[in-house]
UniProtKB/Swiss-Prot annotation:
Protein name: Acetyl-coenzyme A synthetase
NCBIfam families given in the database record: Ac_CoA_lig_AcsA, PRK00174.1
Assigned EC number: 6.2.1.1
Any one biological process term the GO annotation gives: chemotaxis
SUPFAM superfamilies: Acetyl-CoA synthetase-like (SSF56801)
Reaction(s) catalysed by this chain's protein: acetate + ATP + CoA = acetyl-CoA + AMP + diphosphate
Lineage of the species this protein comes from: Bacteria, Pseudomonadati, Pseudomonadota, Gammaproteobacteria, Enterobacterales
Function noted in UniProt: Catalyzes the conversion of acetate into acetyl-CoA (AcCoA), an essential intermediate at the junction of anabolic and catabolic pathways. Acs undergoes a two-step reaction. In the first half reaction, Acs combines acetate with ATP to form acetyl-adenylate (AcAMP) intermediate. In the second half reaction, it can then transfer the acetyl group from AcAMP to the sulfhydryl group of CoA, forming the product AcCoA. Enables the cell to use acetate during aerobic growth to generate energy via the TCA cycle, and biosynthetic compounds via the glyoxylate shunt. Acetylates CheY, the response regulator involved in flagellar movement and chemotaxis.
Cofactor (UniProt): Mg(2+)
Residues involved in CoA binding: R191, A192, G193, R194, T311, N335, S523, R584
UniProt keyword terms in alphabetical order: Acetylation, ATP-binding, Ligase, Magnesium, Metal-binding, Nucleotide-binding
Domain of life: Bacteria
């Protein structure tokens, strides 16, 4: 694999890069051998109210998983992202907002963003929100989403951002689990010319009898669309901030005070509230942003991720703003109203650094040269990829067509739980191979292990674990530390298990091969198979369901659901549509099955366990080696499934 064509470091990058190959080696070695010294120094990327004396205090030991960084230091995230830039760079653009409609865009300076955040912080205080309270944010991609998040951090409230594509049921579940006191939303969102009924979804979520903690709903007027209104509970954003002062002293927070909860799909069905704290998280987000994107003051940076995902937290907002960068926030989609929209936005705003997902890249690649028609993209210097492994063909297309064969592609591997980049190239320090995330970031100690947890040396393939802590690591799952230990530290003792498999080549470059557990990666978004199965079996006509992922050209993985109906029920085109809509309503459009495979029975072991390995192979059409079927209670089921599969039209 090391024989694959290597992309060398372009001269224009090498000439002014922040980290060259020699510096990377020296800094990486220090970060591993002397983490207290290394991170003690790197922590100075932030302004601290009370400087830390302690740096690292962590344990991955069974029954005693505990992660603390900079634990005696105090700071405020919003002050680091806003206040400290005002004197020198108050007039610099903090956020460029590009609307779904290309005629709508605006520039918001650091001074203006600071003013808006102070006003909203005072609004939150007036509504009785205190340090430690949880605030749910269900917003479109508008600057006010950033204002809401930063205002929470400013007063010490914990934000729980919920992706605007989630259904009312999913929203309710997250509000209940986190005990949110306030919901911030918008009348509607806008995406690819369509309105998204955000306020209606919140109304429906709050009808759930188990939602008892919410006192108010603050509503931003985005479209002016007609919405229901509950007097006393619902409040207009503009009415509230109008009366609020633009002066606010940021709350002094301990480095280990909670900053946000972000729900991510688990393999057991119930979404997990990943909890990040303030100090270590922001040090890590800022440092990774600066070095991985080789950020120079004045660069225009665009991360296409929604604020509802961790990428939107770390690399649309907090990392860039902590570094005083100009970050572009895009309400629309990369290929609407024309396939060249992404390239047009790059030219319009003279973007230097572009960070997007393989799903978007593959969708544009399918359009060929229409994706770059009428654009030159000459402002670009660095390209990035996030969300799932990028296949070499898409990587090469991205490098060649979007980046004009001159921009390094930083293919970043990380997770909601890691807070920031883990395995990634550095533009001036790493020769690139299409499809490889390359080498670990500072302080990250990856290892590949076999099923027993034994480390594998040299060029090999195995489960990807991290053997020691890093500052951006999630501290726990909200309200469930036992599940945190069980999920990430019980498979392999004294190691963090990522749930991903990987290959390491002769150059010690890492190639991520995908999930090894029951989590799907659809368009760069994680979905638990158990969550989708629970939604399916909740349908009154469905007896049983098993969900697997199959390869998909655009989305990376498509959702393939095996469904057995209750006795007396018959499959029909109407039921097919009804079941797909049912899942869409229960979880959201992302979770809609691409294929429903009606069947009478599923392959089970004698103990009743569904053999997913076999279902994956059948769904993917890989029937050459189904492996050991001797433990099946009824081996004949497999033949029947193979026959049924012949008649199924597969998504392209």
């Amino acid at each position: 694999m090391s024989q694959i064509h290597k992309h060398t470091i372009p001269a224009n990058i090498a000439d002014r890069c922040l980290i060259n190959p020699q510096q990377y080696e020296a800094m990486y070695q220090q970060s591993i051998n002397a983490p207290d010294t290394f991170w003690g120094e790197q922590g100075k990327i932030l302004d601290w109210i009370k400087p830390y004396q302690k740096v690292k205090n962590t344990s991955f030991a069974p029954g005693n998983v505990s992660i603390k960084w900079y634990e005696d230091g105090t700071l405020n995230l919003a002050a680091n992202c806003l206040d400290r830039h005002l004197q020198e760079n108050g007039d610099r653009t903090a956020i460029i907002w590009e609307g779904d409609d290309a005629s709508q865009s605006k520039h918001i300076s650091y001074k203006e963003l600071h003013r808006d955040v102070c006003r909203f912080a005072n609004t939150l205080l007036k509504l009785g929100i205190k340090k430690g309270d949880v605030v749910a944010i269900y917003m479109p991609m508008v600057p006010e989403a950033a204002v809401a998040m930063l205002a929470c951090a400013r007063i010490g409230a914990v934000h729980s951002v919920i992706f605007g594509g989630f259904s009312p049921e999913a929203v309710a579940g997250r509000i209940i689990d986190s005990n949110s006191r306030l919901v911030i939303t918008s009348d509607e969102g806008v995406r690819a010319g369509r309105s998204i009924p955000l306020k209606k979804n919140v109304d429906d979520a709050l009808k759930n009898p188990n939602v008892t903690s919410v006192e108010h709903v603050v509503v931003l007027k985005r479209t002016g669309g007609k919405i229901d209104w509950q007097e006393g509970r619902d409040l207009w954003w503009h009415d509230q901030v109008e009366q609020a002062s633009d002066q606010h002293q940021a709350e002094e927070m301990n480095a280990e005070d909670p900053l946000f909860i972000l729900y991510t799909s688990g393999s057991t069905g119930k979404p997990k509230g990943v909890l990040h704290t303030t100090g270590g998280y922001l040090v890590y987000a800022a440092l990774t942003f600066k070095y991985v994107f080789d950020y120079h003051p004045g660069d225009i940076y665009w991360c296409t991720a929604d604020v509802g995902w961790v990428t939107g937290h770390s690399y649309l907002l907090y990392g860039p703003l902590a570094c005083g960068a100009t970050t572009l926030m895009f309400e629309g989609v990369p290929n609407w109203p024309t396939p060249a929209r992404m390239a047009q936005v790059v030219d319009k705003h003279q973007v230097n650094i572009l960070y997007t997902a393989p799903t978007a890249i593959r969708a544009l690649m399918a359009e060929g040269d229409k994706a770059i028609e009428g654009t030159d993209r000459s402002s670009l210097r660095i390209l990035g990829s996030v969300g799932e492994p990028i296949n070499p063909e898409a990587w090469e297309w991205y490098w060649k067509k979007i980046g004009n064969e001159k921009c390094p592609v930083v293919d970043t591997w990380w997770q909601t739980e890691t807070g920031g980049f883990m395995i990634t190239p550095l533009p001036g320090a790493t020769e690139l191979k299409a499809g490889s995330a390359t080498r670990p970031f500072f302080g990250v100690q990856p290892a590949l292990v076999d099923n027993e947890g034994n480390p594998l040396e040299g060029a090999t393939e195995g489960s990807l674990v991290i053997t020691d802590s890093w500052p951006g690591q999630a501290r726990t799952l909200f309200g469930d530390h036992e599940r945190f230990e069980q999920t990430y530290f019980s498979t392999f003792k004294n190691m963090y298990f990522s749930g991903d498999g990987a290959r390491r080549d002769e150059d010690s470059y890492y190639w991520i091969t995908g999930r090894v557990d029951d989590v799907l990666n659809v368009s760069g978004h994680r979905l638990g198979t158990a969550e989708i199965e629970s939604a399916l079996v909740a349908h009154p006509k469905i007896a049983e369901a098993a969900v697997v992922g199959i390869p998909h050209n655009i989305k990376g993985q498509a959702i393939y659901a095996y469904v057995t109906l209750n006795h007396g029920e018959e499959p029909s085109p109407e039921l097919y549509a009804e079941v797909r809509n049912w899942v869409r309503k229960e979880i959201g459009p992302l979770a809609t099955p691409d294929v429903l495979h009606w069947t009478d029975s599923l392959p089970k072991t004698r103990s009743g366990k569904i053999m997913r390995r076999i279902l994956r192979k059948i769904a993917a059409g890989d029937t050459s080696n189904l492996g050991d079927t001797s433990t099946l209670a009824d081996p004949g089921v497999v033949e029947k499934l193979l026959e049924e599969k012949q008649a199924i039209a597969m998504p392209s």
